[in-house]
């Protein structure tokens, strides 16, 4: 009876290498947000270089737009008015998804709507109490850009049909 192991394909290997490199950039940069670079890299490693480039463009644009909306809200809250009631704040943050969604439709980038909203909420919900929310928003955009660049570079390397681990008989 043969028990074959799972085949590890080229795209899987590229993804692992890209994630590792992104996490290493976090060590080099002394950043605790390299996780976002790794996510971007995973999303941008696609079957072909063309598909990767398309995904990278969509990802970068969505991150910049969601990040810009998030940074605007955080700067407003820090400098003008911070809603003291958490329930009301969360309600308003949810309502603020409407202009983000409408903007994505306006610029005909509906495919990036989900990511725009995720980045916006990531900045406004998880970092609402940061001393410098602008820095996190900016770091979030930089990390995504790093992940995209790493993925695009890694995806240029041709990797064969995969590595097949030995199987038992």
Language model region names:
Residues 1-169:
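Alpha-helical transmembrane segments and their membrane-interface boundaries
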